Regions:
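ABC family nucleotide-binding domain
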Residues: 1-190
Length: 190
């Protein structure tokens, strides 16, 4: 489904070059639940950004369903991000003045889905993460764990093939972290 072949990522920093990734080879199959571990600054987020199409590799190839991305155009990357990938970030990235429901619907608004279908899909995603009774709340009225579940629902609403979660429990207490990881594990089975 997804393969990284000899991926390198080099950043220029002033006069210096930083090798963020050097020769990464990985394969992911459908329904794999994978954790990428390592010390701070070792390239984990860079690799997730490359897999998610948010950043581009310097050398190597990212192969999606047997197709090389070397010749991907902007519209190919846009389609990949909008329809194949769901992102969950440590800092939630929720819009404070919008309700929980509106925050989840936003992902579908960008994909051109009708208002009725957006609402139906967003409610289903929020139900999947145990927040169907919180639709009208604003993010400021929720705990960190609840906000992370909203972020997970937003990642799920497009029914993506791949969920990329970058330190999804980093800002949460131990008990809530376990709950969030259980939700992510359950999602990977579907």
């Amino acid at each position: 489904m997804l393969e990284l072949k000899n991926i390198h990522k080099i950043y220029k920093s002033g006069e210096n070059f930083v090798n963020a990734l050097q020769g990464i080879d990985l394969q992911f199959r459908k329904s794999d639940f994978v954790s990428i571990l390592g010390p701070s600054g070792c390239g984990k987020t860079t690799m997730l950004n490359i897999i998610g199409g948010l950043d581009h590799y310097t050398e190597g190839d990212l192969v999606i369903d047997g197709r090389s991305t070397k010749d991907y155009k902007d519209r190919d990357w846009d389609g990949y991000r909008n329809h194949r990938i769901g992102f969950v970030f440590q800092s939630y990235h929720l819009i404070p003045h919008q309700s929980v429901l509106q925050n989840v619907e936003l992902a579908l608004t960008l994909s051109g889905v009708s208002k009725r279908e957006r609402r139906k899909a967003a409610i289903a995603a929020l139900e999947q993460v145990g927040l169907k009774d919180q639709l009208r709340k604003k993010p400021s009225q929720m705990s960190g764990g609840q906000m992370q579940r909203v972020a997970i629902a937003r990642a799920l609403v497009n029914n993506p093939d791949i969920i990329l979660a970058d330190e999804p429990t980093g800002a949460l207490d131990t008990e809530t972290s376990v709950q969030v990881m259980e939700i992510l594990k359950e999602i990977s089975k579907d």
